[in-house]
Amino acid sequence: MCAPLFQPAIIQSVLDLDVYKINMMQAAYRFYPQTQVRYELIVRSDDNLSDLVEEVREEINRLAELRFDAAQLAYLAEKAPYLTAEFLSYLETFRFHPQQQVSVGIFRTAQGDCQLRVTINGIWHETILYETLVMSIISELRNRRYWAQIPQSQLHKVLEDKLDFLDSELKRRNITNFRFSEMGTRRRFSFAAQKTMLDVLRARVPELLLGTSNYHLAQEFNLTPIGTVAHEWTMAHQALVAVQHSQCVALDKWLEAFNGSLGIALTDTIGIDAFLSDFDLEKATAYAGVRHDSGSPFVWGDKIIAHYESLGIDPSTKTLIFTDGLDFARALDICEYFAGRAQISFGIGTFLANDMGNWTNDKGIRYQPISMVVKMAECNGSPVAKISDEPEKAMCEDIFFLMNLKQRFGLEVDLDKAIETLKQMKRQQKKRIQSVA
């Protein structure tokens, strides 16, 4: 019997994913229909997920049963008018083929521990939706296995306490520029927890809630679906065009894909300084705003505003969206700092969708969400990288490609660090000890 915060089948709708995945799917389908990609699961926290391998494989294989039905396609046509009729016709025939596209197994880390491995291979637009779904599956399976004793009342209590704090602080500090979207799908405690949380938010703070990044829940609760683009769009272009032009081409192609709609640029694939070098007057004018996802939000925002001003653009006409590991306290500090200087918005995920407060189990261990990502590792057989404005978020499997990428964008290359990284990579070669069934 499943606890109230869990359900027998985790993904029950093909729309139970992030909006930006379908946006990028259309762009990849249009511009790069034969491009091959590989994604890898990266577990950043200390959680050993290898015991879940069979359950993860089973849930991923169930994705083959999902379809875009007529009602869902009609909903997408209404709520996302930038999706073309041709693309929606393609979605009508779209199928997941997890047994051919996804390998689930175990590898041994450099420390000798076992860890879950999930690798996704295939044509870009045919595999792009797996990321959100795989992460949701892993998070819920882990919590169902080890944290099923957490009652729904704990989630309610944590949420109500947070919303009480928010209400109090907004009044005390007279903050009027705070609005946010819920973006917790990938790292949620469970589907039921995310649904419960959204139900609470729309009842308590409807005037502050802009929408959700989850298409299925947006449809169910009549909320606005929110989302634009992710790092993988820029990362893929590192393998699709000359690497020094990759960011510019990615920015231009995104505008072309949606005729200027969805004009929020993500700034930290290479890093904020490299981004601003490519974000010229034409692009800065065409894009409605930019999104922060790593590094200091205050330093970042100051740089963005100064850049707009240097181009003769009034920053108050542009939107700054913050999405990096936010809670309400941090978001309100950002609101105060940038009040009157630019339009501000927030995307908040784990803090709302996967926080159980100070809940501890009978062994005295406090609940913590998994820290994990599923990121593109290769495009057309070539490595790709995310450098980020926060070293812990940097990702690349090939140190030589990373050094070349940094050099091409005028970033400092630390040779001593590169040599040490090569030594570590040699020690940390992943060894498969269980292959896909």
UniProtKB/Swiss-Prot annotation:
Broadest EC class assigned to this enzyme: ligase
Chain positions with Phosphohistidine modification: H231
One GO cellular component term noted in the UniProt record for this chain: cytosol
GO molecular function, one term: nicotinate phosphoribosyltransferase activity
Keywords assigned: Ligase, Phosphoprotein, Pyridine nucleotide biosynthesis
InterPro entries associated with the record: N/Namide_PRibTrfase, NAPRTase_N, Nic_PRibTrfase, Nic_PRibTrfase-Fam, Nicotinate_pribotase-like_C
Post-translational modification: Transiently phosphorylated on a His residue during the reaction cycle. Phosphorylation strongly increases the affinity for substrates and increases the rate of nicotinate D-ribonucleotide production. Dephosphorylation regenerates the low-affinity form of the enzyme, leading to product release.
Origin: domain of life: Bacteria
GO biological process: NAD biosynthetic process via the salvage pathway
Pfam family, one: NAPRTase_N
Functional pathway: Cofactor biosynthesis; NAD(+) biosynthesis; nicotinate D-ribonucleotide from nicotinate: step 1/1
E.C. code: 6.3.4.21
CDD domains, per database record: PncB_like
Catalytic activity: nicotinate + 5-phospho-alpha-D-ribose 1-diphosphate + ATP + H2O = nicotinate beta-D-ribonucleotide + ADP + phosphate + diphosphate
Listed Gene3D superfamilies: nicotinate phosphoribosyltransferase (3.20.140.10)
NCBIfam families in the record: NAPRTase, PRK05321.1
Function of the molecule: Catalyzes the synthesis of beta-nicotinate D-ribonucleotide from nicotinate and 5-phospho-D-ribose 1-phosphate at the expense of ATP.
Family to which this protein belongs: Belongs to the NAPRTase family.
Protein name, as recorded: Nicotinate phosphoribosyltransferase
Source species: Vibrio vulnificus (strain YJ016)
